[in-house]
Every structure is written in C-alpha cells, then in structure tokens.
Amino acid sequence: MIQHSFMGSICMCHFILLLTIVCTVVVATLGEHNTTDSYWLLRIKSELVDPLRALSNWSPTTHICSWNGLTCAANQTHVVGLNLSGAGISGSISGEFSHLIFLQALDLSSNSLTGSIPSEIGQLQNLRTLLLYSNYLSGNIPKEIGNLSKLQVLRLGDNMLAGELPPSIGNLSELLVLGVANCNLTGSIPVEVGNLRQLVSLDLQVNSLSGLIPEEIQGCGELQNFAASNNMFEGEIPSSVGSLISLRILNLANNTLSGSIPSSLSLLTNLTYLNLLGNNFNGEIPSELNSLGQIQKLDLSRNNLSGSLTLLNTKLQNLETMVLSDNALTGSIPHNFCLRGSKLQQLFLARNKLSGRFPLELLNCSSIQQVDLSDNNFEGVLPSNLDQLQNLTDLVLNNNSFIGSLPPGVGNISNLRSLFLFGNFFTGKIPVEIGRLKRLNTIYLYDNQMCGPIPRELTNCTSLTGIDFFGNHFSGPIPKTIGKLKDLTILHLRQNDLVGPIPPSMGYCKKLQLLALADNKLSGSIPPTFSYLSQIKTITLYNNSFEGPLPASLSLLRNLKIINFSNNKFSGSIFPLTGSNSLTVLDLTNNSFSGSIPSILANSKDLTRLRLANNYLTGTIPSELGHLTELNFLDLSFNNLTGHVPPQLSNCKKIEHLLLNNNRLSGEMSPWLGSLEELGELDLSFNNFHGRAPAELGRCSKLLKLSLHHNNLSGEIPREIGNLTSLNVFNLQSNSFSGLIPPTIQQCTKLYELSLSENFLSGSIPIELGGLTELQVVLDLSRNLFSGEIPSSLGNLMKIERLDLSFNNLQGQVPPSLGQLTSLLVLNLSNNHLHGLIPSTFSGFPLSSFLNNDHLCGPPLALCSGATGKERMQLSNAQVAAIIVAIVLTSTLICLVLFYIMLRMWGNWIKVAVSSEDGGMVEQKTRNGEYWNMNSPELFPSPDRQVSAKTCICNLKIDAETKENTLVR
C-alpha cells in the first residue's frame, strides 16, 4: 500500500516534469516565431523607401505587435496581417515575405512599388487576402499564386503587369474576388476560371485580353459581378452566361463581340446592370429582355442593332437608365413605352433612325430627368404640355426635323439645365417665358429658322454659361441687360440679323471665354468695358460694320488666343490687341488700321495665322516675326509696307501661305525662300523687287501658287521651276525676265494658269507647253520677243479658256490644231507676223484677235485674195448653218403665202359651183373690180396682170372679210 502510494507520487512527478518541458518548448518555439517575424520584417523594411515614415516605429526596441500596419494573433505570438495601403512607400516587394508563414492578409495597395511580384509569395499557405493594386508593378503574374489554396481575395489591378492570366488561378478553390483590371494583360481567359465555384466578383476590365469568353464560365455559379469591358474579346456571348443566375452586374462594354444579343440573358433575373456598349452586336434587341424585372441600368449603345424599339419601361419597372444610342433602330417609340409612376430617369436614343413625332408617351415618365433623342428623324411640333416633365434637367433634341415654335410651357420646367434644339427647323420667336428657367445652364438653338429679337427676359436666366444662336434670323439689338449673366462663358450669335452696338454691360460677363458676333449688321465701337473680360480667349466680330479705334484697355486681355475683326471699319493702331502672349489667330483683314506692325506680336509663340491685309499699315516687316516658328499663314498684302523682307522669316519653317503682294517692298528675292519647304502659296506681286528669281524656289515642292508679277525681276526663269510638280498657278507678268522658257516647265503638269506676259522672253514657244494639258484659266505669253511658229502641240490644251500670244514676233500659219480648242473663250494672236488661213472655228472671235499680222485671212478677216474658188466658198459651220436657215425660212414663208391664196381661191370656186346648180351664170368680182369666169380654165389673171414675187408676197390677198361678195342669196 505504501509502495503503491510511493509509485504514484513518482509518476505524478514525472508527468508534471514532462508537462513543464513541453510548455517550455512551446513557449520557446512561439517566442522564436515572434522573433523570427520581426527579423524578416526588418529585412523587408530595409528594402523599402519610406518618405512618409510610415515604418518609423519598426524597431527591435519595440514590440512587433505595436508596429504600424501590423496585426498580431490573439496571443501576440506571430503576425497575421500587414496593411501598408497608401503609406507612400516605394521599392520592390521582397521575397522575404515568404517567411511570414502565419500571414493571412497582405495589403500593399496604393503605393509606388515597382518590380515584379515575387514567386515566393506562393509560399504563404495561410494567406486569405492579397491586395497589391494601384502600384507600378511589372512582369508576369507568377503561376505560384495558384498555390495559395486558402486565398479568398486577390486584387492586382492598376499595375503595369504583362503576360497572361496564369491557368493556375483555377486552383484557388476558395477565391471570392479576383480583380486584375488595368494590368496590360494579354491572352485569353483561361478555361480553368470555371473551377472557381465560390467566385463572386471577376474584374478583368481595361486589358488587352482577347479570344472568346469561355463556356466554362458557367462553372462560377455564385458569380455576381462579371466585368470584362475594354478588352478585345470577340465572338458571341456564350449562352452559358444565362446560367449565372446570381449575376447582378454584367459589363462587357468596348470589345469586339458580335452576333446577336442572346435571349438567354433574360434568365438573369437578378441582373441590375447590363452594359454591352461599343461592340458589334447586330440584329434586333430580344424582347425577352423585358423579363429583367430588377434591371436598373441598361446600355446597348454603339452597336449595329436594328429593328424597332422592343424594350418597354412598362415591364422594366425598376429601370432608371436606358441607353440605346448609336445603333440603327427604326420606327417610332411605342405608345406603351412608359406608364405613370415610372422610375425611368435617363433615356438616351441618340443617333439612330427613329422617326415619328415627339413621343407623347414620354410625358408619362414623370421621373425622367434626361432625354436625348438627337440625330434621328423625329418631326412635327413639340407638345404644348411638355412642362409635365417637371423633373427634366436635360432636353436634347438636336439634329432632327422638328418644326414650329418653341412652346411657352418650356419656361415652366423649372429644373431644366440644358436645352439643345439645334439643327432642326424651328421657327418663330424665343418665348419670353424662357426667362423663368433660373437653373438653365446651356441653351443651343443654332441652325434653325427662328426669328425676332433676343428677349430681354433671357438675361434673367442667371445660371446660363452657354448661349449659341448661330445661323438663325434673330434681329434687333443684343439685350442691354446681357451683363446680368455673370457665369456666361460662351456667347455665339454669329450669322443672324442683329443690329446696333455691343452693349457696354457685356463687359460684366467676366467669365466669358468665347464671343462670336460675326456675320451680323452690328455697328458702333468696342466698349471700353471689354477690358473686364479677363478670361476671354476668342473674339470674332468679322463681317459687321464696327468702326473707330480700339480701346487701349484691350491690351489687358492676357488670355486671348483667337481674334478675327476682319471686314469691318476699325481704324487706328492694332497695338491694343497685342497684350496677350497666347495668340494663335489674329485676322484684321479689310479694315482701316494704320501705323506699324507691332514687333511684340512675336511674343505669341503659338501664333499660326497672322492676317493684316487690306489696311493702311506702314513701316517695315518686323524681323521679330521670325520667332513665330508655328506660323503657317502670313498675309500682309494690300498695305503700304516698305523695305526688305526680313531673312528671319526663314525660321518660320511651317509657313504655308506667304502673301506680301500689293505693298512697296523692295530688294532682291532671297535664296532662303527655298528653305520654306511647307510653302504652298507665295505672292510677292505688285512690289518693287528686283534681281533674279532664286533657283532655290525649286525646293518648295509643295508650292501650288507662285505669283511674282508686276515687279522688276530680271534674268532667266530658273530651270529649277520644273521641280514644282504641284504648281497650279505661275504668274511672272510684267517683269524683265529674258531668255528662253525653260523646257523643264513641262514637268509642271498640274498647271492650270500660266502667265509670262510683258517680259523680254525670246526664242520659240516650247513645244513642251502642249504637254500641260491641265491648263485651263489662261496661257498668256503676250508682249514678249517670241519668234518662230506657233507649235501645233498647243492644240492639246483642250481645257484652255484664254490663249494670248499677242505682241510677239511669231511667224507662219495658225496651226489647224488650235481649231480643236473647244473650251476657248478668249483668243488673241494680234500683232505678230502670222499669215495664211485662220481656222474656220475661230470665225466667231472678234477682229481684234487677229489684227496687225502679215497676211492672215479668212473670217472674221477678209477672204484670202489668192484663194481658189473652193477656198473662197469655204465657210464656217456657223455661216453655213445661218445660210441654210435663211433659205429654209424664206421658202417656207413663200409656200405659206401661196398656199393661203390657193385656199381662198378654192373657197370662191366652191361658192360659184353651188350657185351654178341653180341655173345662173354668175361672175365673181375681184377686189380690183375685174371679173373671172368661174367656168373658164383661167383661174388666174392674165400674164399682163401678174405682179412680181415681192408684190405677191406682200399684196396678193383676196379680202373676203372687207369686201362683201354675195355669190348666193
């Protein structure tokens, strides 16, 4: 008994000792893991850049569980969570994370991490959440991620990854969320995705994924969100998608999916969001979609859908947004489209082929806020009770065929913000009731036929930011109260019939950025209050009658980019328009501005068009304009500019139009002009340039028009002109060029106007000119020293309308081939030494076309004196035709007169015959009192009583109407 007790005590002691040892080992082991986690975390910290000091308390001197971003287990023995989202850290993700074997959640999202996702991440067997989205990670998604068998959430979106989605993803049997949007992924969706039976959300948006959507997707039976928009998926939507009955969101927008929309989508009765926009779906919209009773947002826009509108809000009772724009839908909106109590808020049917009148059914959609029926074929008038839609904020009906006036009731739609009615056939006035719309932000009525004054009440719409009435017939003045529109940024009134001055109050529209008043009948001067328009970027006042000098205060408008004051009567200096350094267009053409061109214009480095033509500007062209390297149009023509063309303009390499004509510029044409390789039009005419035309012009291969006429240029025409193969117009008239026309001109095959008149060119006319078959407007070689014969090749210029070879020393005959120029309207061969017969087709040209030659003859000149009888009788087609017509008319007239006489005499013979039957011998008395025996063969007067043919034609008439001859009583 004592021994038993003793033995029990020994066993108890052994058990306690063993338990103590085990506990000690466990505690030691757990402590070791805690120490191990801190070691690896400090290693990880050393590889990160921490500008915001988010890891500042990661230190051996503090307990690991107090470190920022860490979550420890309940017993604080190891780390189970690491959250450094948005901590501002950078660097790479270390492979050392693999040592945190108890880690369940790792969130490094929204940082600046780079490099690849380490394959060691696949060793974290306890990981349930991995969030690496919104970084700069690159490389492929490691296939080792498929080893994370407990993973439930994987989000890698918004990175710079590459490659395909690894098939090993299909091993994550517990995965609930997979997000890899915007990762540059390629390839197809691996069929292994169908193994993710628990998957709730699949986000593949904004990648370059391609191929078909796999049928295996049906294996994701719990899927609620499938978003794969903005990829390159093709083919049809698999019908198996209809088996995903838990699906609430289906977004396949902006792919290249095709075929018809499967009716099996109607089985997704829990669907609240369906977006198929931007694909290639065709056919009709399946009416089965009306069974989607939970749908709230439906977007089928930008496809090739056709047929009628089959979706009805009466069945889709939870529908809030319907977008069917940019298809080919036809027909009208169904009468049962909408019922009262509808939840529909947005209806977008733009850019289809819908027709009919404005759908009155929409008036039942009392909750509707936005209606876009633009770019269809709707017609008729707007309903007068449109104001039933009290929740309407945006009414977009532009580019249809609506007619009639704007109903006054529009002014009662108190929530209206946008009214887009442009591109219709609306007439009548703007109703004054429009002034009640205090929330109205934008009103665009352009391209209609509306008329009347702009109502003053419109300026009560103090929330207005945009007004566009372009292309109507509005008349009267601009409302004086326009300055009440403090938020106005766009005022476009171009192309109307507005009159009067610009109201000074417009200067109080201080947010105005675009002011377009062009093409009206406005007058007066620019009010000084314009200086308050500090945000203005564009002012177009062209084609009006504005006058006077510009207010100096306009120089305060520092943000101006586009100014067009052309075709007005402005005067004074243009300096007030140079306050902005942001000008891109300055057009002051056809005014009365004077003074010099301000060199300060060169501060606008982005200036592309500078047009100052038709003014009274003086002085020289500022050399500073050479700083305008973006300039493509420079027009300083029709001024009084003097001096040389500054060589600094050679820096304007983008210039396409250089127009300096009709000034008093002088000096030589500089070779640097040839460096302007974009030049399409060069006009230096009507100046005082001298010297040679530079051969370097041949480098301007894009030149279409070269006008150097009316200068003092001399020397030979450079042979390099043949390099200008795009040239249409070449005019050297009234200079002092000498020598030959270079044969290289035959290479300018697109010429339709060539004028070399009033020079000292000599030699023969090159036969190569006959190859310029596009010449149409003129070929003018007059007033030169050309000799030799007219080349017959000119007969190939079948399109030529004006040919002038006058005042030369040309000899020989006029080539018969010229007679084939059927388009010729003006011909001048005068003042040469031509002889011989003029082609008969030229007989219709005036004498002046052939005067002062040696021996030219034939119509319209005299007949050739030495001609044979046959030649004398040679007449033009027109003359022959005229003679034939005259003969035919004369013969016809004679025949008609004789026929008339015969008829009259035949009538008399009939009357005598009737009387004779009564037994009497009756004599018919003529108008001259003579008698003819009706029974005798002499029915005509004797020869001594016959008259001439002329007398017969004019006088032989038996006047039965004025002389009564009673033959039978």
PLM region spans:
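Plant-biased, solvent-exposed loop and capping regions
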Residues: 1-969
